[in-house]
Each structure stands twice: as structure tokens, then as C-alpha cells.
Amino acid sequence: MCSTMTATMNQTICEKQNITMDLLRSPIQIPSASDTIKIETPSTISSQPSPIQTPLAAASSDNFERPSLSYKDLIIEAIDRSPEKRLKLNEIYQVIRLLHPYYRHRPDQWGWQNSIRHNLSLHDCFVKLPLKQTSASGVVGHFWTVVPELSDKQTLRRRNRQQPRALAKKSDAGRTLSRDDRGSSGSGETSPSPSQPSISPPNENPMPSVQALNVLELLSGMNDYKGTLFQNNYRTNLIQDNSAVNGLQNLLTTTLMQINPQLGALLSLANLNNLTTNQLQIASPSLSPIKAESQSFLLQ
């Protein structure tokens, strides 16, 4: 029995040794760097690129024609394409990239986006609409919309910005003219230059308005002045008739009618002819009233 067990163990040991020798004799294959590892992918995964991915570096804006629209028209086009006719700033960028590949493939994305922001703040046809909700960072955003009535007109914001500049230019021009006038007066020149109009100083005593004139006082003063003029001329024997008085009357009447044509009725009521020859009974200048009185007294 012992001999049988010993023979079985020897046979098992021999078989193991044979298997070990066979493994040592077989060549061992080591993979090289040139070998590729093939990994099978599921058939459900598509090999087409996603439209959200960044364009390849090989594509550039040189391969696409730049649109002829201005930045203002690009913004209006993007907002009109939206269903609610309003877009956020990033949405305006996305619509412009989608409609015009030139801006999608431009390397300087910040350049044309900065121009979009500038035109939004420049033209008054673009209006901000506040958002009702806030973003995750707590920043309140806003929509941009277009006012159709102002889309075809010039911007009011640009005119408002130019008005202070225009006023400053006018004030500078006025100061330059005043300096030129002082220089010309100091050098003895009397005639102003034809290219530089003369600026007259404002009148310190402005004329009163027609409404402030007291017509009755003016007419009464005119009659007093006529009487004084007649007496002075009579005493000095300078006039033989009342032609000077009538000329003064006609001059004053014409002046008043030019100031206000409605004074004709008042002039007729004032009785401007109360100092004519028929009423004043002019005596001969050769004999004064005092001498005539003394002669009549002596005759009595």
C-alpha cells in the first residue's frame, strides 16, 4: 500500500514539472509603442460635433463675407427675430453669431461685442426693460427692446451730447471776436473786417413799450411845447406866421401814427389845431403888444 501511494505522488510531481517547463519554453509577447488599443464605443454615440462647441481653429472670418448692415441694424434685426421682441445682451450676441457666421468666426470677439454695447447706449431707439427676477449671483439684469417710431430717426442722445459742445464753440467764437475788436480799436482801425461782423453793445436805456405810453399826457405836452415855441418866436420877431408850429404838429402826429395806428381817434379828440392862426390872432411883429397898449393908454 505504501508503495502505491509513493508512486502516485511521484507521478503528480512529474506532471507539474512538465507543465512548468512548457510555460518556460513558450515565447512571451511584450506590446510595443506602435500598437494601438481599439476601444469599441456604443452605436448610440454620434460622431457629429455639437453646435454648441467652439469652432475649429482652422475656420476664420476671412472665409465669410462681412454683412453690410451697421451695428445698429444688426441689433434691430436680432431683437425683431425674438418672439417677445426683447433680448438680453448675451442673447443679442448669440443671435448675431447665428445669423452672420462672420461674427461667429471672428478672432476678436470682444471687439464687435464692444461696438454692440456702444450702439445700445448711443441710440435712443433702444430701451432697457428691467427683469423681474435676479440671477444666481444676485445681479439684476435687463432686456433690450426697440422703439419702432425712433428706429429710423437720428438719436437724441447724440444731439444732447453735441449741444454743450456747440454752446462752448459759440462762446469761444464770441470771446475771439471781442478780442479782435479790442485789438482793432487799439491799432486805430475804424472799419470792421468783412469776415468778422461788428458786435454792438446792448442799449443801457431801452425804449419803453407802446403800451406804457400815456397818450393824453403826450398830447398835452405837445400842445404846451407848441405854445411855448410860438411865444418865444413871437417875442423875438423871428416868425411872421405859424408855419413852424404847423410843421411841428404834423411831425408829432406822423410819429404817433407810426408808433400805433390806433391813436388816430385820440388825436382827433385832442384838438391839435387849437394854436392855429385863426385862434391865436397874431399881431404885426413891428408893433409889440406892450407898445400898442401904452399908445392906447396915452390916447385915452
Swiss-Prot record:
UniProt region (Disordered), positions on chain: 153-208
GO cellular component, one term: nucleus
GO terms assigned for molecular function: DNA-binding transcription factor activity, RNA polymerase II-specific; RNA polymerase II cis-regulatory region sequence-specific DNA binding
CDD domains per the UniProt record, alphabetical: FH_FOX
Keyword field contains DNA-binding: yes
Cellular compartment(s): Nucleus
Function according to Swiss-Prot or TrEMBL: Transcription factor. Binds to the regulatory elements of genes that contain the sequence motif 5'-TTGTTTCT-3'. Involved in regulating intestinal transcription of vitellogenin vit-2, acting in concert with transcription factors elt-2, mab-3 and daf-16, and also the TGF-beta/Sma/Mab pathway. Functions downstream of the insulin/IGF-1-like signaling (IIS) mediated pathway, in regeneration of axons after injury and in short-term memory, perhaps acting in neurons, and in modulation of longevity, perhaps acting non-neuronally.
Name used for this protein in its record: Forkhead transcription factor fkh-9
Species of provenance: Caenorhabditis elegans
Lineage, opening ranks: Eukaryota, Metazoa, Ecdysozoa, Nematoda, Chromadorea
